[in-house]
Amino acid sequence: MHDKILILDFGSQVTQLIARRVREAHVYCEIHPNDVSDDFVREFAPKAVILSGSHASTYEDHQLRAPQAVWDLGVPVLGICYGMQTMAVQLGGKVEWSDHREFGYAEMRAHGHTRLLDGIEDFKTDEGHGMLKVWMSHGDKVAELPPGFALMASTPSCPIAGMADEARGYYAVQFHPEVTHTLKGRQIIERFVLQIAGAKPDWIMKNHIEEAVAKIREQVGDEEVILGLSGGVDSSVAAALIHRAIGDQLTCVFVDHGLLRLNEGKMVLDMFEGRLHAKVVHVDASEQFLGHLAGVTDPEAKRKIIGREFVEVFQAEAQKLSKAKWLAQGTIYPDVVESGGTKTKKATTIKSHHNVGGLPETLGLKLLEPLRDLFKDEVRELGVALGLPPEMVYRHPFPGPGLGVRILGEVKREFADLLRRADAIFIEELRNTTATAHDAAAGLCGEADVGKSWYDLTSQAFAVFLPVKSVGVMGDGRTYDYVTSLRAVQTTDFMTAHWAHLPYALLGRASNRIINEVRGINRVVYDISGKPPATIEWE
């Protein structure tokens, strides 16, 4: 059994980041609502508990409290932001509204030599005080320490920015160590779970394969499983893992809706039929999808049509596999958390994969979700450990509706063919161009990024087809052809994103190649919009 950290969620938008930081320390953790029962907390048997932040106020909402069992277990507890405030209130301290609210960067001084912060600092003051650059987001503040607690940190606007009762292993910080803006945040969380809680760092994907395979075999027995294979990371890793466990009991259904990337179908079939020797049913439904999309320009309408048609095609194929008793999905942990499907009595809604909707109920199948405890980065690690090629596992995200939402307006086969080729050229240039010392000196990347490909230095990159024509000149003749926009962003969470400052030479090569190699496009532009105000995808 793995040591476990229990994260109680009070409604913060960044609670998942806490879990990711704990998992990065190779310690297993789960997120659950703050109002779980005392029995649940005891049965979970955590090695430590972390209390998340919240948008709420501790003295206005008296319902948002940690279960009493948290304080009765005798295990270390870390409170973050609101978690610090509810710890203070529940253990006899005082919280009040602050006249000087803090939102953004702050420089915080550590006091005393507590185990949590000792030796962790970003710089020293002239007086020799250790300082940390942290990210604050709070209106309330702890005004009076609970009995047994000592001051651990402060800022000019927040005299009690950290507190600790080291005898009981209780620590609390007003800042957010889980966000990347707090430079030493990962180190702080790692110290809490490894040194203070003493959790074993044995949550490693290579080792997880054996556990997952055993669990799948126990669940499925000798029954058959079907899985909708999209070519995306989640479904591909799920397919590889299930095939490792049950072999020919798995049948993958790969639906080509005519809106895939260049050679994507061949890559998927070569991998799963050729290398893994899995059973794959390949359905070319491009005529059906494109026919229903004819004349449709509204983005949401296009998404609904593509989703509906996928369900129809998949259902028809699934009904041919009469022996199948299970439907496998590539559901991952963020899907479960966001849908309220964590493992408590509140788990009433399990989010279905965007491609299969309510198919488990329609087909009378049981649901198999072997990745539901994993974050995306863990899924990628697992894929590599299973032998999937890195170029498949570390591909940029691709929307479920495919090129259907990267072709503005009406979707036509002609437009999809043009976009496929333009997109492939852009991605090829990103993969083949590495960051240089000159790029780093120009501020386009960090010094540590020199030598990495620009594909790896961007979080998502693609081409967009614009259904407008512009005048151009090629050779001695006038052209009147379509426009494509290139889009590349950098982000840590996809909730916000910066446009990628790519080298001009790279953009120039991509533009020249697209215009010369893709007949029908004569103008290329680069999208320099951030998120917000723009979204990453155009539709």
UniProtKB/Swiss-Prot annotation:
Keywords: ATP-binding, Glutamine amidotransferase, GMP biosynthesis, Ligase, Nucleotide-binding, Purine biosynthesis. One of its GO terms (molecular function) is ATP binding. It catalyses: XMP + L-glutamine + ATP + H2O = GMP + L-glutamate + AMP + diphosphate + 2 H(+). The active site is at C81, H176, E178. One of its GO terms (cellular component) is cytosol. Its EC number is 6.3.5.2. ATP binds at S230, G231, G232, V233, D234, S235, S236. It holds the Pfam family NAD_synthase. Residues 203-395 form the GMPS ATP-PPase domain. PROSITE patterns: GATASE_TYPE_1, GMPS_ATP_PPASE. Pathway: Purine metabolism; GMP biosynthesis; GMP from XMP (L-Gln route): step 1/1. PANTHER family: GMP SYNTHASE [GLUTAMINE-HYDROLYZING], GMP SYNTHASE-RELATED. This is GMP synthase [glutamine-hydrolyzing]. It comes from Burkholderia lata (strain ATCC 17760 / DSM 23089 / LMG 22485 / NCIMB 9086 / R18194 / 383). The lineage of its organism: Bacteria, Pseudomonadati, Pseudomonadota, Betaproteobacteria, Burkholderiales.
